[in-house]
């Protein structure tokens, strides 16, 4: 199989199996932009809620607006000043760590470093959350305004749901718009694999690719992790089994494709996963899948393109990653 650079981007969905894996997404807003990630978003009391909040010289005004602009891998820096917290969503952004938020910055110094002298005051926050927010560089002013008792109850419930994402969950039927904790429509939850299951202890995940091993009909989910790649066997989707994970450079985005070809000497299908990493310098990781279902390993690293957003296979059966008859398969590296 040859490897070529490509400026085109193709989107392929593997439909060989259904594996529902909610990793760290708990957001009722627009879907994250595919490429606009790993940025700092800036907030200042004298800013303006316009644009993407990613320019230190033109910060946004509110945490809620900055949160809506934020994508996976982003973080929010808040300048010194006074901020009124009067809605549940803003408080959830502050407390959940889905998008890390930190106070104590100086707009005049381009939000470069936090300093305890830069007082970022929050009012309207229930007292029970003051200590956690203090650890993030905020000073909480307790008053009778802002989030009321009912809203405080809602935020507690949201945080509890977020915390429950960190543990494994069994199958759950979609009933009245929910499958367990998860909103649903015409789709049941078969299982939930928390990030804590992976040996590399990732803080987030970013991609998933399905792999059907034609040798033994087993099925796998190959996941791009914040700090590597993991493989979960989902042959029985209600009882997923952790195979293993491989550490790599931290990044908010990886892309994965699998290629299988028949080895006439062993009379078996050999399979490899190709993994690119965006905003990184690790090249294309080639993972040996031939030892599944027992283990995975890195067979080599191709450093022709040390950073790339997408990887794509052409001239293959997209459901299996097997080359089509009488044509040569190609590996495309895009967005390098």
Predicted feature residues:
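Right-handed parallel beta-helix/beta-solenoid
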Residues: 32-65, 82
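Active-site-proximal beta-strand/loop segments in catalytic clefts of secreted hydrolases
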Residues: 44-46, 79-81, 104-105, 225-227, ...
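N-terminal extracellular ligand-recognition/capping segment immediately after the signal peptide
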Residues: 72-100, 104-109
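Feature marking well-ordered beta-strand scaffolds used for ligand recognition
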Residues: 112-336
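Bacterial N-terminal signal peptides that target proteins for export
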Residues: 2-18
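N-terminal, post-signal-peptide region of Sec/Tat-exported proteins
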Residues: 61-81, 210-229
């Amino acid at each position: 199989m040859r490897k070529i650079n490509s400026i085109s981007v193709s989107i392929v969905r593997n439909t060989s199996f259904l594996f529902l894996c909610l990793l760290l997404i708990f957001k009722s807003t627009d879907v994250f932009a595919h490429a606009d990630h790993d940025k700092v978003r800036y907030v200042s009391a004298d800013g303006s809620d316009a644009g993407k909040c990613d320019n230190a010289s033109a910060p946004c005004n509110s945490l809620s607006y900055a949160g809506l602009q934020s994508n996976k891998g982003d973080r929010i820096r808040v300048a010194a000043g006074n901020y009124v917290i009067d809605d549940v969503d803003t408080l959830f952004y502050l407390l959940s760590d889905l998008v890390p938020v930190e106070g104590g910055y100086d707009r005049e110094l381009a939000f470069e470093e936090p300093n305890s002298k830069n007082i970022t005051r929050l009012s309207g926050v229930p007292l029970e959350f003051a200590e956690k927010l203090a650890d993030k560089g905020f000073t909480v002013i307790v008053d009778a305004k802002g989030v009321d008792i009912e809203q405080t109850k809602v935020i507690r419930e949201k945080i509890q749901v977020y915390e429950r994402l960190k543990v494994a969950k069994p199958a759950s039927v979609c009933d009245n718009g929910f499958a367990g904790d998860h909103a649903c429509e015409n789709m049941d939850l078969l299982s939930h694999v928390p990030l804590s299951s992976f040996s590399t202890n990732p803080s987030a995940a970013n991609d998933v690719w399905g792999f059907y091993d034609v040798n033994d009909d087993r099925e796998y989910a190959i996941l791009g992790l914040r700090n590597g790649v993991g493989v979960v066997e989902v042959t029985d989707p209600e009882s997923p089994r952790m195979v293993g994970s491989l550490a790599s450079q931290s990044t908010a985005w990886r892309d994965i494709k699998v290629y299988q070809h028949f080895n006439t000497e062993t009379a078996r299908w050999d399979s490899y996963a190709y993994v690119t990493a965006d905003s990184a310098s690790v090249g294309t990781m080639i993972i040996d899948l031939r030892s599944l279902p027992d283990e995975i390993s890195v067979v080599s690293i191709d450093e022709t393109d040390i950073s790339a957003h997408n990887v794509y296979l052409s001239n293959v059966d997209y459901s299996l990653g097997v080359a089509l008859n009488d044509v040569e398969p190609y590996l495309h590296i895009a967005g390098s």
